Each structure stands twice: as structure tokens, then as C-alpha cells.
């Protein structure tokens, strides 16, 4: 039985103009997974350039930003490409009771440790950085980039997606992902601005609402497998096309004909 991560796109109503625009852009988007042991990858330079623009990190001769969490077994980094050009990047950690290395655990262990002990599993996104010109040309770039984190919550069966955010950015996470505050404001090592921890619990009702409003977050099992389960071979870093439109169209067909599960695999 075929399934997509569109938990019922409950109605076959047309998408909003905003969602339609992002579906069109995603037809031109590819995602690449990065080998964590190769520090000359362009995404590390993109990080450096983005942080230097805000003077969030000191100057270094290498012109890259890397840290110990780039090489943990539960970490993975991705580049976002539009028309073949690298425009943004993001790092994810799959945080479990057995694998407790992640940025959020560095700053908020008192919040997360009891939850991990209870069996909760988290996707912990970090290092979201973008090319300056691309951020002006594509104001919705955060949506295109954070889509990778949404796919990861589905692929790994996480119970919550975390977000270490600046206080002034919390409204975005509350509005888009229905995230809730989990901590006070704290300092993150190496960054010049304060952060707080937010989390979006992964529930069928909440996913249903998010996918209905933002269908471009949807994906197929095939796309998720290519990003998160690919073997470390010579194709590992090859950019992969997105499947938002295909997943959305499948969900509409399944909702139209009824009786077919559209829950995530």
C-alpha cells in the first residue's frame, strides 16, 4: 500500500498562492547530503560567510566554520541548491537515549535528558545558514531549508523537532510549526547572540494541520530514503531532486478516492 507523509491533506482544496509558489520553486531545488569528514565542502564556507556578516564568529584563515558536532555518528549536514547553485545549508542530529550528542544537549541538557530517559527522540536542526544574495532573491528560503528537518522527523519517527532560535525568531516557529517554548534564554558557545529552545511535538493532528497549510513540506518515502539512508558511496553527495509536488498530488488522489492510507511510512 503506497503512502506519503501527507496525513490526509484532508481536502482537495487548491493550495494558497504562497504554497503554490514554493511548490514551483521546489521543482528547481535539489538537496545534497555532505560527507561530515570533508571540511572543504562549500557548505562550511557558506556557514563562515553567513556568520561573519553578522560578526557572530571570529575571523579565521581557513574561512570555514566547523565544530566537534560535525563528526558525531548521529549528525548529518545538507546543502540546498536552486538551479544548481548552493543557496543554503543545514545540519541535523537525530537525538536518542543511545546517541545524546547534539547542539541542544550542549546548552539544554537539563531540559532534554529527562525526556530522553523516557524514550523521546528528537531531530535537532542547527547551523542554518544562507547565501546573502539568495536570501534576498528567495525570501522563503527558510521554508525550503527547514523542509529537510520536517522530512527527517518523518523518516526517523521522531517524537519532536527541536529549534535553537533567537528570541526574535520564535514567532516564526510558533506560527509555522506550532512549536512551544521549552526553556529560558541562554548563551550558546561560540555565538554572539542569545538563544532559547523551542520544540514541535510530532502528532498526527499537528502534522495534518502543517501539511494542509504548507503542502510543500510533504515528501515521498523515496526522497527521504535517498537523503537519510543512502550508503556512503560515490553517489553519496550527488544532489537529489525534491518530491513535494509528487507527494502532494499523490495525497490529493488518495484523498479523492478515499479509503487509502496517506500516513507516513
Region spans (language model):
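A short helix-loop-beta-strand connector motif used in the catalytic cores of GNAT acetyltransferases and
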Residues: 69-78, 100
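Short amphipathic alpha-helix that is part of the acyltransferase structural core
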Residues: 18-67, 77-81, 86
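Short glycine-/small-residue motifs
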Residues: 89
Amino acid at each position: 500500500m503506497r503512502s506519503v507523509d501527507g496525513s490526509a491533506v484532508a481536502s482537495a482544496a487548491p493550495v494558497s498562492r504562497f504554497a503554490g509558489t514554493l511548490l514551483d520553486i521546489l521543482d528547481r531545488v535539489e538537496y545534497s547530503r555532505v560527507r561530515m569528514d570533508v571540511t572543504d565542502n562549500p557548505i562550511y564556507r557558506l556557514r563562515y560567510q553567513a556568520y561573519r556578516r553578522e560578526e557572530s564568529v571570529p575571523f579565521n584563515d581557513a574561512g570555514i566554520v566547523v565544530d566537534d558536532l560535525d563528526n558525531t555518528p548521529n549528525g548529518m549536514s545538507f546543502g540546498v541548491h536552486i538551479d544548481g547553485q548552493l543557496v543554503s545549508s543545514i545540519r541535523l542530529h537525530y537525538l536518542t537515549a543511545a546517541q545524546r550528542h547534539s547542539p541542544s544537549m550542549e546548552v539544554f541538557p537539563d531540559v532534554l535528558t529527562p525526556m530522553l530517559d523516557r524514550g523521546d527522540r528528537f531531530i535537532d536542526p542547527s547551523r542554518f545558514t544562507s547565501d546573502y544574495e539568495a536570501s534576498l532573491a528567495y525570501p522563503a528560503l527558510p521554508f525550503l531549508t527547514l523542509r529537510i528537518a520536517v522530512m527527517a522527523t518523518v523518516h526517523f519517527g521522531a517524537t519532536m523537532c527541536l529549534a535553537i532560535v533567537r528570541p526574535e525568531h520564535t514567532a516564526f516557529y510558533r506560527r509555522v510549526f506550532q512549536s512551544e517554548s521549552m526553556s529560558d534564554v541562554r548563551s550558546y558557545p561560540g555565538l554572539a547572540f542569545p538563544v532559547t529552545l523551542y520544540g514541535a511535538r510530532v502528532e498526527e493532528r499537528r502534522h495534518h494541520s502543517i501539511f494542509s497549510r504548507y503542502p510543500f513540506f510533504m515528501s515521498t518515502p523515496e526522497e527521504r530514503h535517498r537523503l537519510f539512508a543512502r550508503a556512503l558511496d560515490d553517489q553519496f553527495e550527488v544532489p537529489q531532486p525534491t518530491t513535494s509536488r509528487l507527494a502532494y498530488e499523490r495525497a490529493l488522489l488518495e484523498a479523492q478516492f478515499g479509503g487509502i492510507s496517506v500516513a507516513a511510512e
